[in-house]
Design a protein with these regions (language model features):
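Alpha-amylase-like alpha-glycosidases and glucanotransferases acting on alpha-linked glucans and related
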Residues: 11-12, 16, 20, 100-106, ...
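Short, Lys/Arg-enriched N-terminal segments with co-localized hydrophobic residues
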Residues: 1-9
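Short, acidic/polar
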Residues: 42-56
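Replace the tail clause
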Residues: 9, 14, 25-26, 135
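Substrate-binding cleft of carbohydrate-active enzyme catalytic domains
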Residues: 54-57, 61-65, 104, 111-148
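Aromatic-lined carbohydrate-binding/catalytic grooves of carbohydrate-active enzymes
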Residues: 22-28, 33-37, 57-117
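Aromatic-lined carbohydrate-binding surfaces of glycoside hydrolases
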Residues: 69-79, 140-157
């Protein structure tokens, strides 16, 4: 970036609007503890339509920060779409943490109207946002992933995190994860939860 462009950029006042995508457009007011996505609802990327974005831009906002866009661990079953199911014992609640990334190359299916077209919906969200004169920010968390990270959308030739790890070592600089060799997670004393009946 040239000095003149940098100085011009620094004189521009930034105003960032954060939209936690899965809650932003949610119109279901039920707040059932440990409720399913059907019971408690979820916002969708399509809820951030041109009208909403025009209202945000009208506030003097320059950037919209979309939180929770990258696919992360949840208890919602999307295995019919080829998305690996997560162990509920390692998911924060049912909706999960948007920072427990399960695939850096994919979009969270919860916030898509059509799961099969979630990337297209995200691209359309970016297009709509730019069309209203706003810039887009999303969270990218390079050092915090879900324990069951498994990319289904990675480019050819890219290994999953942990794929080449030496699991026989507690710590190795070349590993993506920490391990407890010879120690196994015993969840036999943890009560099970019937997700079908709640």
């Amino acid at each position: 970036m040239g000095r003149g462009l940098f100085i011009s950029f620094m004189k521009t006042k930034l105003a960032i609007y954060q939209a936690f995508t899965r809650t932003f457009g949610n119109r279901i007011l039920t707040r059932k503890e440990y409720g399913t996505i059907t019971e408690n609802g979820v916002g969708k990327m399509n809820d951030l339509d041109r009208t909403v974005l025009q209202q945000i831009q009208g506030l003097g906002i320059t950037h919209v920060w979309y939180t929770g866009v990258i696919r992360h661990a949840t208890c919602t079953d999307y295995s019919l779409f080829g998305i690996p199911q997560q162990n509920p014992h390692v998911v924060k609640g049912r909706a999960g943490s948007p920072y427990a990334i399960t695939d850096y190359y994919d979009i969270d299916p919860d916030i898509a109207t059509n799961v099969d077209k979630r990337m297209e919906e995200f691209e359309n969200l970016v297009f709509r946002t730019h069309a209203e004169g706003l810039k887009v920010l999303i969270d990218f968390v390079p050092n915090h992933v879900a324990r069951q990270y498994k990319s289904i959308a990675k480019p050819e030739g890219v290994e999953d995190l942990g794929q080449g790890d030496d699991t026989g070592k507690h710590f190795d600089m070349q590993n993506n994860f920490y391990y407890c060799p010879g120690e196994y997670l015993d969840l036999s004393g943890v009560p099970t939860y019937d997700y079908a009946t709640g």
